[in-house]
Amino acid sequence: MGTFHSVFSRILRVEAERIGYSQNFTIYDDADQKSLIKAIIKELGLNDKVYKPSTVASRINMAKNNIITPDDYANDRAIMTRDFETHMPDVAKVYKAYSERCRMANAMDFDDLLTNTYLLLQENPDVLEKYATAFEYILVDEYQDTNAVQQKIVALLASRHNRICAVGDDAQSIYAFRGANIDNMLGFETAFKGTKVFKLEQNYRSTKRIVAAANSLIRHNMRQIKKDVFSENDEGEKLLLNMAYSDKEEASIVCSEIKRTMKKQGCDYNEFAILYRTNAQSRSFEEALRKSSMPYKIYGGMSFYQRKEIKAVIAYFRLVATPD
């Protein structure tokens, strides 16, 4: 049991020599990848203000997730047109140099763990037979988040026994920007003949109002697996939607709502919780809470102002402001 990356890395450790790597290959993390790309951009004499390492890395990763090699990338008219229109016509050169450097260093990045596993199985029938036979039953969770190469690998591994169970919800597909392909879910019955579909339509977590609101939005999807989601919980309170034009305005609205509720219902601060999706969003809320003199505590993360680098900058400013 494991993630796609962990399971495939174990397979590659055993079979690495079949694709030209040694078994002790290094796995580059995101920082390693961007550092190497940055160096290549500099060596090629490209403008790093235009060719930002994070942007180039994103395009390379997307290509790998769709099994597009450096040569395929350079010969794809649609891709090259897009790169030209965004003033980055030489991404193909960076991609090719990056791939060559990784192989020379006996290194793979996270997306290589996927593409190299696919190539290993696709080009070596004996290796495919070995693992397709070993994996009698395959269970994949959150199938709506799988990308093109993951789907192809799953199909190869399931080719021997044809016993695969995929769990997912097409209505929760939100990672297309990372390469997730909703067609994997919508086309599952076509890709795997004899599929039986079990719809889990009862929502045990949310109130009836929340489920009804979700259904009213999802029903507008042109392509979907039809479902009639329902809840047997309480009706629940009416939903409230506040539109904000910036992160600062959003934080200000939240603080105002806290004040309003406290005044109306006599609540304490410890009865409120602010949920945000990423740690980077904490800053705007912290600034608004501090400005409103509201006490708060960060759970499961670190306050923006407690981060080492931020404390160092603040300490420097204090020194400049009060040198004595």
Task: Tell where the protein language model's regions lie, with residue ranges.
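Conserved helicase NTPase motor core
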Residues: 29-32, 82-187, 199-206
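Basic/charged alpha-beta structural segments of nucleotide/phosphate-handling enzymes
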Residues: 38-107, 111, 125, 182, ...
